[in-house]
Amino acid sequence: MRRAALWLWLCALALSLQPALPQIVATNLPPEDQDGSGDDSDNFSGSGAGALQDITLSQQTPSTWKDTQLLTAIPTSPEPTGLEATAASTSTLPAGEGPKEGEAVVLPEVEPGLTAREQEATPRPRETTQLPTTHLASTTTATTAQEPATSHPHRDMQPGHHETSTPAGPSQADLHTPHTEDGGPSATERAAEDGASSQLPAAEGSGEQDFTFETSGENTAVVAVEPDRRNQSPVDQGATGASQGLLDRKEVLGGVIAGGLVGLIFAVCLVGFMLYRMKKKDEGSYSLEEPKQANGGAYQKPTKQEEFYA
């Protein structure tokens, strides 16, 4: 359990301090089987480390200034931890890249603490500690070869090494490369071969300008055509809408006129019927009264009263 806790602690340090502590990353990687499977590729990277070291020794002064600037800007991004002081002390070593042998010496100094703890826990881990030390020796060369391959090819204008280093490096190295690439363009512009570097940005800038001009021209052309289409389309739509509106209005007017005429006719008929009814009623009143008088004549008292005397 204690050993697993130590492995987890080392992995956490590796993830939190990737750009600042490549040595700790190297010590954390060998226990994992991934670096063990890549020992063969580490040998190739170790063979190429010598050539990279010769190139970097020829240009130590610009690389140290740029590395110190990058390292001072990068440690601020990770979370504040108690090991930042050690990160600052160890970050100066990869800046020069000359004291890589000293870095290899620092690794065994850190490991003996772990080996001592393991020896206190169990006597057998001595054999297991010897095996990781051999792997660490190989992985240190691998990491030192990968780091310059990722950082310096940008400064020395060697794209070949950069292409081989980016896929070969693990996920942690890939996370570390963006910081170096961010500072890479400034380093290449200030490094040697200013003519090549000036041609590249000039071509890129001209291409970008061409793209921007083309897009702006297309946009202006589209904008110039769209207003015409928009101006023409409303006229067509207005004409069609006006014709449709007139047709609709004619129909509406026809319907209104027909309705008005029907209403007038109905009103006239109603008024005539009412007048006829009134007249009929007047005439009917006399006709009705006459039969009443005839019927009532039998019952009516005689107008002439004849008095009969007995």
Curated annotation (Swiss-Prot):
UniProt biased composition (Acidic residues): 32-42
Where are the annotated glycans?
Answer: S37, N43, S45, S47, S206, S216
Marked site, Cleavage, at: A242, S243
Pfam families attached here? Syndecan
Show the segment(s) annotated as Disordered: 27-100, 114-212, 284-310
Q: Which GO terms describe its biological process?
A: canonical Wnt signaling pathway; cell migration; myoblast development; positive regulation of exosomal secretion; positive regulation of extracellular exosome assembly; receptor-mediated endocytosis; striated muscle cell development
What is the designated name of this protein? Syndecan-1
